[in-house]
Structures are given as structure tokens and as C-alpha cells.
Regions:
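Short glycine-centered segments of the SAM/dcSAM-binding site in methyltransferase folds
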Residues: 84, 147, 171, 236-237, ...
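Glycine-rich beta-strand-centered segment in the early N-terminal region that forms part
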Residues: 21-38, 50-91
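Glycine-rich phosphate-binding loop and adjacent beta-alpha segment
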Residues: 223-292, 329-330
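NAD(P)H dinucleotide-binding glycine-rich loop of Rossmann-like/cofactor-binding domains
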Residues: 78, 88-152
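Mid-domain Rossmann-like dinucleotide-binding core that forms the NAD(H)/NADP(H) cofactor-binding site
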Residues: 122-198
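C-terminal hydrophobic helical "lid"/dimerization subdomain
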Residues: 273-330
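Short amphipathic alpha-helix with an adjacent loop that forms part of the alpha/beta core around
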Residues: 200-210
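N-terminal Rossmann-like NAD(P) cofactor-binding module of classical short-chain dehydrogenase/reductase
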Residues: 86, 149, 214-217, 239
Length: 330
């Protein structure tokens, strides 16, 4: 089968595209004929040598996937050959990833694809959608009528947070760096959009939410705790999902006096059961046209190395090249 893979960690140049043996289906696994995958920052960190866990050699990267079941192990009873499925949490914890024509995946990580969606959409929404849902509803416990600030409303996770928060009736404040992204945030449902290149973000948040925001979702790899604590309401909740190596200053005094709380989480540590709860809502919202995948561009799988370069330019070099996900067609 054709696959994107690497044998040693390093720059995107270590990624090869070629033939690898087809995967063997385990007893409680399925073989998915992959239709589309998407690129996430963690894919680039692993490829660059982040020492999270030992990697198989060769290693196929990729967390997200959408495609069709073509084979099943004898213990799989709740799925069927020919069924369209989507999911994430691959290429992690030592598991092989999805950037290949075929992927052997434990059945517990699979979710049925909604009717009238395509593989490109479901691959684009997988990790970022599950991440947003976990943070909003299992950690921040966002309620209808509350106010949330999320940085970067057109980003992969940010765009999901905006849409999901609006879906339950929250007030959404977000940021955008140019008029095009401002318009996209408005289209996604944001109530207040702050141009961080032209305005003082802290002052604009105070104008939009005089009593503070109930939830502050930080997407930066270097969290701005001064901004967050100043912007939060009494008993405000801060969500952290990035910044593994960050060690920024922290304003302890106002944080505890307000009775705030901080919730950090890594999506890939959520159980399959927790992720199924997320997937159920995602499927419902996709079917109801409430939630839409945000795709910046679609490339062939053979251009995985270039996709990694683009992702790194956006994530690490902060070039704001992307407005949505990079999807690879298989």
C-alpha cells in the first residue's frame, strides 16, 4: 500500500512516500480504507523528535481519518463491512498512524460517519472537534447563557469552540488578525470579534463582557495568564490544551481571590467512551448543519512533507498561513 512514513525523526524532509506492507487486522480491530486524513500540530512534534513514547520503525504519522471498513476482526460485532467511519487518536501512544491507504484501527476508536458528509469533512473535524467538545463540556462545563473567550476563531480548534459554544447558546468572544478572518468568525457565529493587530485585546474583552468571561480558552503555546486572569469573571474557568514546554509567569493573587480554576487536558488521554460522547454530538451537529468543518486546503497524500511544512509555519513560526485544517486525500 502507499503510505507517508519516516524512519528517523527530524525536519519534514525525513518524510518518505512509497510502498509499505498492508496492515494485519487484529481480533478487535478493523481495516479502514482511508479516504482522507488531516494534519495536526502533534503530528509535526512527533516527527520532529518529541519524546512522548517509542515509535515503530517505519512510523506512519497521522491522528485523524475517515474512510470505509473493508475488513474486521472476529471480536468486532457493532460495525459492518462497507460502513463509513471516522475517528482520531491514532499515531499516538505508539500506535501506527493513518497517513496510508489502509489502517488497522482498534474498533473502540471508530465513529459512524453521518449521512451526506464526505471523508474530507470528517477527517478535518476529528481531533479538533473532539478536543473542543472535551474542553467545553467535560472540563469547562460551559452552560447556556455563559460567556466564553477563545483565541483564534478561525483556527482548527478555535473554529470548533466558536461553533459548539454557539450551538448551546453561549456568548462567544474571539480574535482574528485580518478582515477575511473577521468575516469568517462572524459566519461561524461569534458575537464579538477582536482584531488583535489593531486593538487592545484586554480592553476589548472588558467592553464585551464587563463582568468578565466565564470561560477563557487559551490556544497559544505560550499562555498569557495575565490576560486570562484579568479577563475572567468570578469563578471563571481557564482551558489549556497547548504549551508543553511553556513556563510563563502566573498572577497567583487575582487568580485565587476570584476563585478561578484552570483545566489542562490532552485530548489523546481521553478514553474511547469519553470520545464517543463527543462524537455523538458532533455527528448530530454535522447532520443538522450546525457544525461545519473548516478546511484551508486539500492536498494529495504524496505531499505530506509539504503539509507538515505549512503546519509548522503556522504553529511554530506564527505566520498565520492557515484558516482551517490541511486535509490530505488518500
Amino acid at each position: 500500500m502507499k503510505a507517508a512514513y519516516f524512519r528517523t525523526t527530524g525536519s519534514p524532509d525525513v518524510i518518505e512516500f512509497g510502498d509499505l506492507p498492508e496492515p494485519v487486522c487484529g481480533d478487535d480491530q478493523v481495516i479502514v480504507k482511508v479516504g482522507a486524513v488531516s494534519v495536526n500540530p502533534i503530528d509535526t512534534y512527533i516527527r520532529n523528535g518529541a519524546n512522548y513514547w517509542p515509535l515503530p520503525n517505519p512510523f506512519i504519522p497521522g491522528c485523524d481519518f475517515a474512510g470505509e471498513i473493508v475488513a474486521m476482526g472476529p471480536q468486532v460485532k457493532h460495525l459492518s463491512i462497507g460502513q463509513r467511519v471516522w475517528g482520531s487518536n491514532q499515531g499516538l501512544m505508539g500506535r501506527q498512524g493513518t497517513f496510508a491507504e489502509l489502517a488497522a484501527i482498534d474498533s473502540k476508536w471508530l465513529h459512524p460517519s453521518p449521512e451526506f458528509t464526505d471523508d474530507t469533512e470528517m477527517a478535518a473535524i476529528a481531533l479538533v472537534g473532539i478536543t473542543a467538545h472535551l474542553g467545553l463540556f467535560q472540563h469547562a462545563m460551559l452552560q447556556p447563557g455563559e460567556t466564553i473567550f477563545v483565541r483564534g476563531g478561525t483556527g482548527g480548534v478555535g473554529s470548533m469552540v466558536v461553533q459548539m459554544a454557539k450551538a448551546i447558546g453561549a456568548v462567544v468572544i474571539t480574535t482574528a488578525g485580518n478582515p477575511t478572518k473577521h468575516a469568517k468568525c462572524r459566519e461561524l457565529g461569534a458575537d464579538y470579534i477582536i482584531n488583535y493587530n489593531e486593538s487592545n485585546v484586554a480592553e476589548e474583552i472588558k467592553q464585551a463582557a464587563p463582568n468578565g468571561v466565564n470561560v477563557f480558552w487559551e490556544t497559544l503555546r505560550e499562555p498569557d495568564f495575565e490576560l486570562a486572569v484579568g479577563a475572567m469573571s468570578e469563578e471563571g474557568r481557564m482551558i489549556l490544551m497547548a504549551g508543553r514546554d511553556a513556563r510563563p509567569p502566573f498572577p497567583v493573587g487575582p487568580f485565587y481571590v476570584k476563585g478561578c480554576s484552570m483545566h489542562g487536558f490532552a485530548m489523546f488521554k481521553a478514553s474511547a467512551e469519553q470520545q464517543h460522547v463527543c462524537a455523538s454530538d458532533i455527528n448530530h451537529w454535522m447532520t443538522s448543519d450546525i457544525l461545519k468543518a473548516q478546511i484551508d486546503r486539500v492536498l494529495p497524500l504524496s505531499e505530506t512533507a509539504q503539509a507538515h511544512r505549512l503546519q509548522e509555519a503556522s504553529t511554530l513560526q506564527k505566520q498565520s498561513l492557515l484558516s482551517g485544517k490541511i486535509v490530505l486525500k488518500v
